[in-house]
Regions:
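Hydrophobic alpha-helical signal peptides and transmembrane signal-/tail-anchor segments
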Residues: 1-8
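A structural signal for isolated positions on well-ordered beta-strands in alpha/beta enzyme cores
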Residues: 124-126, 182
Length: 222
């Protein structure tokens, strides 16, 4: 009888510990996860029209958006476009160029649905994105903020995912320990920094692989 009771106690104790260690929040990247990667695809489309090397043009723009501080709200959008024009020689009206980016941030309905199911299951769901004022513009045209408990935009947060402390800051804001948070991103460098900050991670490669990846970290959704 004693050993039987002890076995039951140990099972309950293990189940309780397992429940305590379950993921309680999921942070999603925006471009490349919740939506198509409009920044990269838009810039590459611009480069193609200008007969420029697409990858090189995108990499230059990516470097500039961080160097100018635009992505963390330290510079206005016009500064970014002026710097890009100076570096690449592209002289078009930036208002036309930005549309090439914005129209390519197409929301992925299946990913929004999955986020909703996680939320219905009691998890905190949030966006953590290196974005700019563009994110609010996208939301104003096709609202999606209401699908999430939090939207962390580097432009507002004042830190990008290139700064590993951003992950710890977000964990404090939502009140959940890093090891109980799952971070989903298509950028391997961001994934590495999030992992080093103590978060569980999924390197997103496509919707087809995402459900099995969730199950691998203990999350099952119908």
């Amino acid at each position: 009888m004693f050993f039987s009771f002890l076995s039951i106690y140990r099972k309950i104790d293990k189940d309780l510990f397992k429940e305590m260690e379950m993921i309680k929040a999921v942070l999603f990247d925006f471009g490349g996860v919740i939506a198509e990667e409009g920044f990269r695809e838009g810039l590459m489309a611009v480069a193609k029209k200008k007969n420029l090397d697409e990858q090189s043009f995108f990499k230059t723009a990516e470097d500039i958006i961080y160097k100018t501080g635009y992505v963390i709200g330290k510079a206005k959008e016009k500064i970014f476009w002026e710097a890009l024009s100076k570096e690449t020689g592209v002289k078009d009206d930036y208002r036309r160029l930005r549309l090439e980016i914005l129209r390519r941030f197409v929301l992925r309905t299946e990913m929004l649905s999955l986020a909703g199911k996680l939320r219905d299951a009691g998890m905190v769901v949030a966006i953590l994105s290196d974005q700019t004022n563009w994110l609010d513009e996208i939301n104003s045209k096709k609202p999606f903020y209401d699908r999430f408990d939090y939207v962390f935009n580097s432009y507002v947060l004042g830190k990008s995912k290139r700064d590993s402390s951003a992950f710890r800051d977000v964990a404090k804001i939502i009140g959940i320990k890093p090891h109980l948070i799952l971070f989903v991103d298509d950028n391997s460098h961001h994934i590495k920094r999030a992992s080093e900050a103590g978060l569980k991670t999924i390197h997103f490669t496509g919707i087809e692989d995402f459900k099995p990846q969730l199950e691998a970290v203990g999350i099952k959704i119908n």
